[in-house]
């Protein structure tokens, strides 16, 4: 739990964590008022809150930005004109450089088709990390979310398929690296505790190294 707040009503309190919960009876029971179930209305991972105890007006900060409520948290409005997205990595489409992709902290893999500031949309959920676009075919896109879950699209990002089941038993980083051979975009390498290689654009993968995490630290 990140933090807890109690306002003038001694029976009403809020606890902030991944979910946001509220009690109306002094802590005897708690109701989740912001969680994965309503993440289309308010983001998860809650960190900060300001409360007007007389009006029920709330300002709430989380990994999705700033949200307000006028009824003690029953419903929410997103203040969505604040530029606060944090990118882990970006990728520029070689054939169509106005198309830019980015993996963002807790806010999906997103892209713009025009390069404009108001034209970004999600193509994959979770924490977005690395994205690669085939320089010979803009319809082929690779993107990942946390713990090495790698997806591929062959239709320009309209639909993504999971191609990471080969290493589902491997140890992976929160942000797992993968690269494309600049001479052959069908050849890619993916890093878990060992290195995986595909020469078929991700249809099949084989490990090409042993465990690389137990050697000399240098």
Predicted features along the sequence, with ranges:
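Beta-propeller blade termini and top-face loops
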Residues: 1-218
